[in-house]
UniProtKB/Swiss-Prot annotation:
Cofactor note: Binds 2 [4Fe-4S] clusters.
Domain 4Fe-4S ferredoxin-type: 2-29, 31-59
InterPro entries: 4Fe4S_Fe-S-bd, 4Fe4S_Fe_S_CS, PSI_iron-sulfur_center
Organism: Methanosarcina barkeri
Positions with a binding annotation for [4Fe-4S] cluster 2: C19, C40, C43, C46
Pfam family, one: Fer4_7
SUPFAM superfamilies for the chain: 4Fe-4S ferredoxins
Lineage of origin: Archaea, Methanobacteriati, Methanobacteriota, Stenosarchaea group, Methanomicrobia
Name of the protein this chain belongs to: Ferredoxin
Transmembrane segments: none
UniProtKB keywords: 4Fe-4S, Electron transport, Iron, Iron-sulfur, Metal-binding, Repeat, Transport
Swiss-Prot/TrEMBL cofactor(s): [4Fe-4S] cluster
Length: 59
């Protein structure tokens, strides 16, 4: 699964743009990324793209 560190996430949306499965959305209210782990294929694109290293993907 992929997890978002809310303290590190700036809500920039880079991960949303990079996710090939559209498994990430931005929670406008909280200002952070949210991963739908049912859709996530653990490819690591979001983790690689995140400028704040706020997402970790674990197999």
């Amino acid at each position: 699964p992929a997890t978002v560190n809310a303290d590190e996430c700036s809500g920039c949306g880079t991960c949303v743009d990079e996710c090939p499965n559209d498994a990430i959305t931005l929670d406008e209210e909280k200002g952070i990324a949210v991963v739908d782990n049912d859709e996530c294929v653990e490819c690591g694109a979001c983790e690689e793209a995140c400028p704040n290293q706020a997402i970790k993907v674990e197999e």
